[in-house]
Amino acid sequence: MDAFVRLKDARFGEPVVPDEYTFAAVVSAAAALPAMHSGMPLHAEVVKAGLETSVFVGNTLINMYFTNGESGSARILFDSLPEKDVIMWTEMVAGHSSSGEAELALKYFISMLQEGYKVDSFSLSSALNSTAEFAGLKQGEMLHAQVVKSGYEGNICASGSLLDMYAKNGALQGAHLVFYTIPKRDLKCWNSMIGGYGNYGNSEMAFKLFGEMIRDELQPDHVTYISLLSACSHCGLVEKGKFYWFCMMTDGIMPGFKHYTSMVSLLGRAGLLEEAVDLLQKSPFAKKCPELWRILLSSCVALNDLSVGIHAAEQALAQDPDDMSTHVLLSNLYAAAGKWDVVAEIRKKIRGMMVEKEPGLSWIEIKSTIHVFSADDECHSQIDDCRGELLRLKGNMELLYSSENELLSSG
């Protein structure tokens, strides 16, 4: 940046005017800095220099905006450019994918294909990563066809993302087939497969694959142990969970939030509440992550343990006093203990919180279109159609119920 400023200010008879290559280099260097401090002023300089339509400079500006989490600015710039190249389209797919905007990443990928651009393994990988996070198996299967069509079946980048997509969507047979077609599987591939089996309740296969991975002389990382501990938690395998926790510590991997989440859940659901409290209190997350205390509280509700449950609720509410889910769990805990006067007080507080709380949104995908709605939503464009369909279904259910009653009475 300093060199660029000196270049601009230099005077050797005529001012030195930076060209598109200079701007591209400077914008790339400034991408790691906050956009407001360096990127946006540089963008203004690009416009002043008359280079705002340069594809070369545009690519670096779009990358800079995505690096700074300014995806909206990246879209505005992209739409304003009269000419685009394959690098720019790939940047739009990858940028939205890495920023968690899966639907937009897929939208730009499809538009890229429609515009006739040839996709590479990187753009395919980014699109597949989006379907994995988006839980879009149908779109993922379509992208699988594109991987085959483009000749990237043996490519570790595309195949690894394809495997991850199938595993996260619970399509374990598809994941299994892809996994064993990859000639040189890296740690990410093994982690995806172990995680897929673990998250969907097949702990036996998860542990078997882990053994194969060790025999292949791959060193497990923190993601591997998240998957293994999650598998133990899902299946209630306490001793196995403790074993993998010990292995993780032996490997010199410090447990993170997700590791503690699985262990607290595992110990809590097994009724080992005191062990769970001890583990949690010794963790670095005890004073800053109320989610862990809520997990413990949920186990206390299931086991009707009032004393540990109250302690867990106090810890969670000390960090997040307005969390409604903690209040609801605490209410259920007191209800199970028959303390209805306390339940009434908590529920009164919950009602007050509901008045102040902004409604959450839900979404559903129907025929490749995302529909967003909330409770008591009167503004949706198809609200009348929805009501009509509900009435039709209600009528069918009532008709079926009356028919069953007639059959029973006649029998």
Could you tell me what each predicted segment is?
Residues 1-411:
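Terminal (and in a subset, N-terminal) low-complexity or junction segments at the ends
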